[in-house]
């Protein structure tokens, strides 16, 4: 009886055992192995053969080049500038603008906190302001109703 059960299990166990032995000896399953290559003998340190021609910066680009700190004055900016230089200047100005906006956001939050604390000390709240508005609206509606009733009686 055990021989019938043991047969398929033995075959499966043998297969697993062979697989484990292969893993132990080789260290990997040799699937999709790329050949080991060392660093190439002549790495290309030169720029690629193609390069975009010089770019004539607009007035806005010149301002960005100055704001980014690349040039001190407009006169120092050459007639043609590489696109990479203008792109780097735009990125630097973009980052500076983000920092300025973060600072302004933090400043605005602090101003709102201070104004909220002052409103609390004056006993002002949105609920009280809304209640006053609604009471005024009710009075105006009541007054209009009375005026309409008086006009209807007069006619």
From Swiss-Prot:
It is a single-pass membrane protein. The keyword Transmembrane applies. The chain crosses the membrane at residues 95-114. It is found in: Membrane. InterPro entries: DUF1075. Keywords: Membrane, Transmembrane, Transmembrane helix. GO terms for cellular component: membrane; mitochondrion. Its main location: membrane. The keyword Membrane applies. GO terms for biological process: cellular response to hypoxia; neuron apoptotic process; positive regulation of release of cytochrome c from mitochondria. Belongs to the UPF0389 family. PANTHER family: GROWTH AND TRANSFORMATION-DEPENDENT PROTEIN, PROTEIN FAM162A. This is Protein FAM162B. It comes from Danio rerio (Zebrafish). The gene is fam162b.
């Amino acid at each position: 009886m055990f021989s019938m059960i043991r047969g398929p299990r033995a075959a499966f166990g043998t297969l697993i055992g062979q697989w484990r032995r292969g893993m132990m000896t080789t260290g990997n399953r040799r699937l999709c192995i790329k050949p080991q290559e060392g660093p190439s003998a002549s790495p290309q340190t030169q720029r690629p053969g193609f390069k975009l021609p010089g770019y004539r910066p607009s007035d806005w680009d010149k301002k960005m080049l100055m704001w980014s700190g690349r040039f001190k004055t407009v006169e120092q900016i050459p007639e043609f500038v590489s696109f990479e230089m203008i792109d780097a200047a735009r990125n630097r100005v973009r980052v500076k603008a983000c920092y300025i906006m973060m600072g302004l956001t933090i400043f605005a939050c602090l101003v709102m906190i201070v104004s909220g604390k002052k409103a609390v000390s004056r006993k002002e709240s949105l609920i009280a302001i809304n209640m006053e508005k609604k009471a005024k609206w009710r009075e105006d509606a009541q007054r209009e109703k009375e005026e309409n009733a008086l006009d209807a009686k007069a006619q």
